[in-house]
C-alpha cells in the first residue's frame, strides 16, 4: 500500500511538472508593440574636402582618427578625390563604400566623389545608383543652369544585419555658386527620392551649400524633416558646420549649417537621441574645412 501511495504521488508530481513545462514552452502571442524591432545606429555627413587649399596628405591621418573616435556606422562624405578615397579604404578596413565620381567614372583621379561609407559587419548593400543635378539627371557628368561644377547624388539601399530593417541613404553635394542650380537640385532630389525610395525610410545627407533659411532647404522640407529639429538633445548646435580651416575656441557664426541630415517620410516613428557637430581639432588644426554632423538615433521598422 505504501508503494502504491508513493507511486501515485510520483505520478501526480510528474503530471504537474509536465503541465508546467508545457505552459512555459507554449508560444506567447505577440503584442502589436513586440512586432516592431528597435534599431539604433550612428549616421553622419562630412565634407572631407579635396586638396585645395590644404593638401590631403597633411590631413588624412586626422580624418581617419575622427572616423575611429566617432565610430560612424554609416556616413555620406563629399569631395574626396580618387587618391583620398583609396587612402580612406586602406586606413578604415571595417568599412566598405558605394558611389561613383561626378564624371561617372570611378577611376577618374582629378574630380570629386561623394561616396557612402558603411560598416561591413553592420549593413548589407542591397542596391545602389546615381543621378546628376542637371536637366538630364541620368547622363553621367552632365550639368545645367548656372552650376559652376558637376554635382550629383549617390544612393544606396541598406539592410541592417542586426534587425533586418531596410532603408535608403542619398548622399549629395549641391553647387556652391549657382542659386538656380541649387533650387533645381532640391526639386530633383525630391522627385528622385520619392521615385526610388518609395515607401521606405530615406535619409538625405550632404553639403547643400545653403543654410536652413535658404530656398533650396525650404523646397526639401516639402518631403523631408531636419533631424536637428527633431533631436532630443544637441551639441555644438551654435557652431557653423563650415570652418574654412580657421581655428576658433568659440562659435564664429550663429548656428547656420551648410551641411545637413534630413529624413523622410514625415510620419516615421523615430527618435533622434542626439544631433551634434564634431569640432575636433588637432593642435588647433582642423582635419577639414567642414565639421562632421553626427546623429545618434533610434527608429522602428515594422516586421514584414
Regions found by a protein language model. Name each.
Residues 74-166, 274-277:
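Structured beta-strand-rich core segments of catalytic domains in phosphoester-bond hydrolases
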Residues 41-48, 63-89, 117, 156, ...:
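Active-site beta-strand/loop signature of hydrolases that rely on acidic residues for catalysis
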Residues 18-92, 102-112, 130, 187, ...:
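N-terminal, active-site-proximal structural segment of metallo-dependent hydrolase catalytic domains
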Residues 50-52, 133-145, 172-182:
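Surface-exposed cleft-lining segments at the edges of enzyme active sites
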Residues 7-17:
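Bacterial N-terminal signal peptides
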Amino acid at each position: 500500500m505504501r508503494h502504491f501511495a508513493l507511486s501515485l504521488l510520483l505520478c501526480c508530481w510528474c503530471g504537474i511538472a509536465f503541465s508546467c513545462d508545457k505552459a512555459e514552452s507554449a508560444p506567447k502571442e505577440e503584442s502589436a508593440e513586440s512586432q516592431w524591432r528597435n534599431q539604433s545606429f550612428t549616421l553622419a555627413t562630412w565634407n572631407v574636402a579635396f586638396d585645395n587649399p590644404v593638401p590631403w596628405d597633411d590631413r588624412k591621418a586626422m580624418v581617419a582618427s575622427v572616423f575611429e573616435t566617432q565610430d560612424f556606422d554609416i556616413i555620406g562624405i563629399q569631395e574626396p578625390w580618387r587618391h583620398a578615397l583609396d587612402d580612406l579604404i586602406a586606413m578604415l578596413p571595417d568599412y566598405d563604400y558605394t558611389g561613383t565620381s561626378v564624371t561617372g567614372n570611378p577611376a577618374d583621379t582629378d574630380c570629386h566623389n561623394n561616396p557612402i561609407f558603411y560598416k561591413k559587419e553592420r549593413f548589407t548593400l542591397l542596391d545602389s545608383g546615381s543621378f546628376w543635378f542637371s536637366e538630364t539627371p541620368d547622363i553621367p557628368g552632365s550639368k545645367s543652369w548656372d552650376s559652376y561644377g558637376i554635382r550629383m547624388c549617390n544612393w544606396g539601399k541598406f539592410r541592417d544585419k542586426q534587425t533586418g530593417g531596410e532603408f535608403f541613404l542619398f548622399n549629395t553635394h549641391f553647387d556652391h555658386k549657382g542659386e538656380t542650380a541649387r533650387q533645381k537640385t532640391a526639386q530633383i532630389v525630391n522627385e528622385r527620392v520619392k521615385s526610388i525610395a518609395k515607401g521606405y525610410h530615406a535619409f538625405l545627407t550632404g553639403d547643400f551649400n545653403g543654410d536652413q533659411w535658404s530656398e533650396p532647404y525650404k523646397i526639401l522640407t516639402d518631403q523631408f524633416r531636419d533631424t536637428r529639429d527633431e533631436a532630443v538633445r544637441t551639441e555644438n548646435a551654435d557652431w557653423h558646420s563650415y570652418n574654412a580651416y580657421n581655428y576658433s575656441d568659440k562659435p564664429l557664426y550663429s548656428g547656420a549649417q551648410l551641411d545637413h541630415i534630413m529624413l523622410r517620410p514625415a510620419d516615421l516613428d523615430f527618435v533622434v537621441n542626439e544631433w551634434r557637430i564634431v569640432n575636433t581639432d588637432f593642435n588647433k588644426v582642423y582635419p577639414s574645412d567642414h565639421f562632421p554632423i553626427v546623429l545618434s538615433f533610434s527608429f522602428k521598422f515594422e516586421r514584414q
